[in-house]
Amino acid sequence: MTEIAGKLFTWINTRLPIVNTFERHLSKHPVPSKVNFWYLFGALAAVTLIIQIVTGIWLIMPYSNTEEQAFSSIEYIMRDVDYGWMIRYMHTTGASLFFAVVYLHMFRGLLYGSYQKPKELVWIFGCTIYLAMMAEGFLGYVLPYGQMSYWGAQVIISLFGAIPYIGESLELWVRGDYYISGITVSRFFALHVVALPLVLIALVFLHLVALHEVGAGNPEGVDIEEHLDEDGVPLDSVPFFPYKVLNALVAIGVFMTVFSIIMFFFPEGGGYFIEMANFQEANPLVTPDHIAPVWYYAPFYTMLRAIPDPLGGLIVMAAAVAIFFIVPWLDRSKVASIRYKGIFSKIAITMFGVSFLTLGYLGTVGVTEVRKTMSVICTIIYFAYFLLMPIYTKYETTKEVPERL
């Protein structure tokens, strides 16, 4: 029996390079021997993506993508489908934690220069993944057809109307009707469960292929490829499997514990994961007292509200996301890691982080004059971090980077 299995494996391996692929990307793929916890969020993002895909498949089975039955089918899932409540809460909790770990993953990239040469494509693919996530999250947000889903979608889609000349036609084309209706739900459903997941999977594949081609970074910003042994393997590296895989499994265990606690005991997340208004069916005749996006869109929604002109707000909001794509060419520093950059880089990234968190908070609360002023200030700080980067990274005094880890 063992001999037959061995021959079968050999037959398959000569036609499908299983061993070579495993060795190249796992058992013999060199990764830096010294990294910190910031480098675990990529693995956690992959775990949450898998959770979203699996739970999403189960949710679409009993879900009905019609205006009349969308909300009631969610209630049916929650009340009558075996473990339907758990699958739904896994999906909603997973959505929020997916964005949380991706935000931390992106922040790590800014901290340690994970966009510098030759990692530009790795960064660009990552930013495109984030853009696809935003679209995927918005489309899924509309599907429960609750009050906040309806009015939130109404506000966001109406932004297209601010574009000169083509705005009204584009708004109608996106919505598919003159108001949020079953047509909108149906087309958003198709995009959410088929089109964008395929795009996400393809982008993640390209992101990983590009990463494995140029090699992973490290907190020191040291290029481990500069010091090789007689076999051409970096001296300051270990095989990805089993060392980093086992390390990631510990982090995944802790993450899933936190995930489970939230899912079972705080599934609504205090109204941040699932808004209380979304437990009511959409009513086009009744506007909620306060229309706010899900927390992971809140910083950009705050920027939108900070600009009085609708078109100006739309441009600022779009630019806030798009500017990440050009970071590799904005940073003129000779060192990658924040550990060895100058004081201006450290102050700038601290102010950027504080402004982003403040914008996130302001996007979840009502508008007052003080909050509007804070929104404008934080928006300016947000963009200043990027736009002034070519100046402060070029002229600041940096520390000497060690030759090896």
What are these regions (language model features)?
Residues 2-97, 101-405:
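Membrane-embedded and interfacial regions of multi-pass energy-transducing membrane proteins
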